[in-house]
Amino acid sequence: MSIQAFIDGMNAQMQRERSKTQMTLGQIIEALEGIPADAQVANLRGPHSYRGYYDDLAFKRSEGTRYASDLLADCKAAMGKAFEGYKGGRYVMGEMTPVWIADYGCCGVKLIALRAGGDIDVDYDD
């Protein structure tokens, strides 16, 4: 086994552990599909590779709310897409990818829950 394969395996295991304590891209899509398309949800925008873990996904939180259907479209577009890491590299986002709330290039908070009306629950990384 090469050193790179070993490191990749460790990174994948750490990502699986993170996905147990916060929403994943697949879970957000599932939650949004259960909310009426015209419902207002948190104004999460600009999906990007998360600064803390480049293979995780982050959204910037903007003021106000947006339609659930618009956020759902952004989430579906991120599925399977490769994002450039903050210091380089390309990272493909998938169903089990943990999601964070953070500005580009910054660390942020874990997304725990997304609700109609614009509320989200977040938590800090351990």
What residue spans do the PLM features occupy?
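DNA replication sliding-clamp ring fold and its partner-interaction surfaces
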Residues: T21-I35
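Detector for the mature cores of small, proteolytically processed
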Residues: I3-R18, A39-D126
